[in-house]
């Protein structure tokens, strides 16, 4: 090889055979291209444990008592490289667990502590997560010891639980079962800002703080929920109360839970701002290899202990910050407060007057005492009328406060895990909670063939059977494991009245299916899924393919009493590319919306492609529209959608916004109409490659088989009991 070709002057003396870091990407060249990467995250290729590893099975061998004993010991085993405040790591571990679980938001179910995502960017480097890299390193010896039996996701949350227990709180319980991911999540929208802690104005439609952009549940980029100094760093407890009410509600918390969590989180530990925050080093993701993933190097003093800088606020909230008590409310409600600046220059509230013995002691020297402090969010609990009433009640009744907090903490740390059937371990509470979306156990002792025969003999069409089953199952979100066909909530409020479920058509179909369920002993939930299966089997037969759609009985029927109507509002579909429907025009393109829904359902690009092609020819479009029904054999499960989409005898002409006519190139005759959701499978190079596979003459049966496999995946997405 000519050395002159491999060593151009001033450039890297290596031939660039791979794009590992600095080369231009497709996104750089075509920033508006459809990003299918979000459908192919967390592939087995990135998982070092291998595709045959079962965390559920590994957990069965975990010595939980020994683990908890080790965590209790860790809390007071202060390490010189990162010493514990007052000799107790409780406050740090609670903040780590809180900031892991607290990223959850109800709008799309994303975020939360269910995947151990705090280990990766951007969360590992958020300004609100300063020093949590140290918390995880303190846990590493325990993770190393228990290995594959214990995920990081479970350990991070459990460490917070044990921290509270070690300081005197009786917790409500704990469930294992969170599985780790192995690279950053690509599907979560954290905001459009390009600057940490940028002014919040870009997230709001007006000065009204309730207009926070959906699906966000934090007021600024890089914060977990609200700014502790006040709105955009300007102290005003009443305005901050507005932010709290919005952000906590988007984490599924009511006013009482909000007060409990805020006060309970600040009953222990302290804030850190005894230094110059501008001197902190780079966040973990941007550090040199020699730092080994530890960030925010602090050159002030020892850079740790009393010199630690995190939020910039400085001080403890209570007199005894390593014990669970009612000290927070005692301090907040019995003192007058004034604004001060911390040593780091952050706004905080300090008492106008306080007895010396009521001040918390220094983290290193108990002979030194400092003023306690309150954040603007803490002061909101005192000045907001509703929060104040709740705070007064908690102050008067420590036992009640402890109970409400323990339940709210359990909800915060488990909300993203889905139904109780996913909970593992010896400390799972027996009580069923409404926010867990309970579903009674279903029956398996009925005759499935009899149910299918009754459905086949009914007056319901293939499109009605398939569309109803699809609508029942499509609500599933792999983000927080909510929704799905189990429970048959499609027959209850609010789902029965959702516009996207075509209430009139749905009611007509449900009457028939509910009667069949009652006559055969099957649950309505199972009957709805079987209805879809029967429709598909009929359609496949019409296409010349005999196939039995796999089915697992056992879905239960839930009730109105077991359904929190308000909490299900966030699951209402406002679009469904699979049924070629948009409730209205949105700023985001229809194909991007379909991609988002596909990711939430846990489907791949190939599965999305085959499902759309199949559902189109089955005539399941919303309202019976004919857009994208590229077939003369509607109701037969053929590959006609793909064959005709890729046929160059046709041309595609727009005739209205986002609508197209498919015309014969020679005659100009309009053959079909289409939406962007149809044509994207021919225009996007990746999706077209899948469409071409299914359009091939030798893949007609493969198309049916792949459609059925993807269909069953959707129908069983919420059958966590099958994993057992």
UniProtKB/Swiss-Prot annotation:
Binding-site positions, heme b: 266
Which Pfam family, any one of them, does this sequence belong to?
A: peroxidase
Q: Where is this cross-link: Tryptophyl-tyrosyl-methioninium (Tyr-Met) (with W-98)?
A: 225-251
Give the matching InterPro entries. Answer: Catalase_peroxidase (IPR000763), Haem_peroxidase (IPR002016), Haem_peroxidase_sf (IPR010255), Peroxidases_AS (IPR019794)
Active site, per annotation:
99 (proton acceptor)
- Locate the region Disordered: 1-20
Q: Where is this cross-link: Tryptophyl-tyrosyl-methioninium (Trp-Tyr) (with M-251)?
A: 98-225
EC code: 1.11.1.21
**Assigned protein family:** Belongs to the peroxidase family. Peroxidase/catalase subfamily.
Q: What is this protein called?
A: Catalase-peroxidase
Q: Which gene encodes it?
A: katG
């Amino acid at each position: 090889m000519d050395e002159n070709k491999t060593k151009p002057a001033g450039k890297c003396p290596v031939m660039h055979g791979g794009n590992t870091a600095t080369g231009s990407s497709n996104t750089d060249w075509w920033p508006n291209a459809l990003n299918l990467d979000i459908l192919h995250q967390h592939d087995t290729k990135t998982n070092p444990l291998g595709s045959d590893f079962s965390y559920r099975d590994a957990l069965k061998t975990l010595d939980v008592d020994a683990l908890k004993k080790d965590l209790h010991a860790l809390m007071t085993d202060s390490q010189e490289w990162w010493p514990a405040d007052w000799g107790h790591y409780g406050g740090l571990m609670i903040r780590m667990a809180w900031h892991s679980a607290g990223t959850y938001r109800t709008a799309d179910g994303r975020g939360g502590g269910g995947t151990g995502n705090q280990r990766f960017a951007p969360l590992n480097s958020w300004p609100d997560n300063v020093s949590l890299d140290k918390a995880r390193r303190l846990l590493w010896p325990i993770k190393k010891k228990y290995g594959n039996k214990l995920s990081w996701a479970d350990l991070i949350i459990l460490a917070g639980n044990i921290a509270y227990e070690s300081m005197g709180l009786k917790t409500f319980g704990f469930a294992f079962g969170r599985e780790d991911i192995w690279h950053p999540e690509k599907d979560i929208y954290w905001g459009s800002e390009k600057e940490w802690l940028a002014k919040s104005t870009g997230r709001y439609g007006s000065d009204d703080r309730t207009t926070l952009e959906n699906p966000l549940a934090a007021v600024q980029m890089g914060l977990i929920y609200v700014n502790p100094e006040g709105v955009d760093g300007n102290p005003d407890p009443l305005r901050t109360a507005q932010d709290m009410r919005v952000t906590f509600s988007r984490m599924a918390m009511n006013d009482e839970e909000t007060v409990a969590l805020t006060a309970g989180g600040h009953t222990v530990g302290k804030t850190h701002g005894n230094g110059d925050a501008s001197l902190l080093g780079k966040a973990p993701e941007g550090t040199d290899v020699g730092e080994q993933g530890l960030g925010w190097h602090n050159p002030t003093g020892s850079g740790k202990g009393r010199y630690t800088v995190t939020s910039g606020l400085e001080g403890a909230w209570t007199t005894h910050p390593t014990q669970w008590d009612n000290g927070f409310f005692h301090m907040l409600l019995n003192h007058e407060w004034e604004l001060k600046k911390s040593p780091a220059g952050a706004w905080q509230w300090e008492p106008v007057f306080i007895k010396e013995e009521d001040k918390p002691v220094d983290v290193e020297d108990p002979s030194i005492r400092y003023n306690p402090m309150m954040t603007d969010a803490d002061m909101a609990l005192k000045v907001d009328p509703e929060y104040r009433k709740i705070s007064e009640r908690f102050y008067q009744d420590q036992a009640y406060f402890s109970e409400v907090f323990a339940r709210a903490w359990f909800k915060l740390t488990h909300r993203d895990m889905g139904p109780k059937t996913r909970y593992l371990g010896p400390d799972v509470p027996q009580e069923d909670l409404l926010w867990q979306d309970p579903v009674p156990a279903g029956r398996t002792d009925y005759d499935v063939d009899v149910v299918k025969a009754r459905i086949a003999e009914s007056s319901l069409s293939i499109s009605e059977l398939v569309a109803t089953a699809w609508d029942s199952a499509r609500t599933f979100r792999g983000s927080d494991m909510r929704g799905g066909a189990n429970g048959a909530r499609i027959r209850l409020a609010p789902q029965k009245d959702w516009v996207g479920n075509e209430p009139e058509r749905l009611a007509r179909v449900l009457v028939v299916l509910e009667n069949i369920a009652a006559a055969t002993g099957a649950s309505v939930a199972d009957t709805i899924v079987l209805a879809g299966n029967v429709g598909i089997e009929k359609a496949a037969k019409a296409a010349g393919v005999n196939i039995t759609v796999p089915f697992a009985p056992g879905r239960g029927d839930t009730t109105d009493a077991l359904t929190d109507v308000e909490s299900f509002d966030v699951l209402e579909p406002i679009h469904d590319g699979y049924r070629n429907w948009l409730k209205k025009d949105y700023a985001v393109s229809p194909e991007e919306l379909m991609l988002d829904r596909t990711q939430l359902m846990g489907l791949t690009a190939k599965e999305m492609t085959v499902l759309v092609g199949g559902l189109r020819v089955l005539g399941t479009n919303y309202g019976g529209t004919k857009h994208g029904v590229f077939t003369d054999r509607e109701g037969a499960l053929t590959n006609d959608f793909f064959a005709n989409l890729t046929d160059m005898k046709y041309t595609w002409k727009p005739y209205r916004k986002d609508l197209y006519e498919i015309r014969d190139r020679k005659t100009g005759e309009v053959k079909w109409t289409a939406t962007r959701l149809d044509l994207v499978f021919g225009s996007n190079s990746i999706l077209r490659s899948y469409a071409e596979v299914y359009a091939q003459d030798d893949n007609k049966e493969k198309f049916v088989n792949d459609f059925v496999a993807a269909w069953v995946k959707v129908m069983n997405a919420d059958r966590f009991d099958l994993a057992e």
